[in-house]
Amino acid sequence: MSSFTHFNEQGRAKMVDITHKEDTVRVAVAQTSVTVSREIYEKMTSNAIEKGDVLAVAQVAGVMAAKKTADLIPMCHPLMLKGVDIAFAWENDGEAHKLVITATVKTKGSTGVEMEALTAASVCALTVYDMCKALDKGMVIGPTYLVEKTGGKSGHYRRKTD
């Protein structure tokens, strides 16, 4: 079990010691989507959802989620984030209306921010679902994935596109 860094000698979970790692600028970009009905799309784009401005609330929820990642994911280190940005884009194809959510998280530190970016994107999507579920519970979230990460010993990663 010694090849897994999140396990101690007894095979129990531990938080990895990162004191020896060099501080570098770290950036992670994660993406997810929410596919919604035409009714939800029309109401969201005209800001007519009863609970309020869905994208504004989701954006704040995503930033908050990035900052709280270490409270949600047991082995994540609490990080001093330097920036969190949430972007939204619609992809419409006939009757399919997909809200693409992109979360970009930055820090300067000794561990990456991939989990923070993934958490931010996921909580944005969950917030959209929560605010729109009264209209249609058939919304589909995902897929959720890491698009890119830079910094650290493992270097640059960019997801291969389909």
From Swiss-Prot:
Q: Does the keyword Hydrolase apply?
A: no
Q: In which pathway does this enzyme or protein participate?
A: Cofactor biosynthesis; molybdopterin biosynthesis
| Entry's family note | Belongs to the MoaC family.
Q: Which UniProt keywords apply?
A: Lyase, Molybdenum cofactor biosynthesis
Task performed by this protein = Catalyzes the conversion of (8S)-3',8-cyclo-7,8-dihydroguanosine 5'-triphosphate to cyclic pyranopterin monophosphate (cPMP).
Q: What is this protein called?
A: Cyclic pyranopterin monophosphate synthase
- Binding, substrate: M75, C76, H77, M115, E116
Q: What is its EC number?
A: 4.6.1.17
Q: Which residues form a coiled coil?
A: none
Reactions catalysed, semicolon-separated, are: (8S)-3',8-cyclo-7,8-dihydroguanosine 5'-triphosphate = cyclic pyranopterin phosphate + diphosphate
Q: Name one GO molecular function term.
A: cyclic pyranopterin monophosphate synthase activity
Top-level lineage group = Bacteria
Positions of the catalytic residues: D130
Query: Record's SUPFAM superfamilies?
Result: Molybdenum cofactor biosynthesis protein C, MoaC (SSF55040)
Q: Does the keyword Oxidoreductase apply?
A: no
Quote the subunit structure annotation.
Answer: Homohexamer; trimer of dimers.
What is the organism field in this record?
Geobacillus kaustophilus (strain HTA426)
- Enumerate the Gene Ontology biological process terms: Mo-molybdopterin cofactor biosynthetic process
- Matching CDD domains, A to Z? MoaC_PE
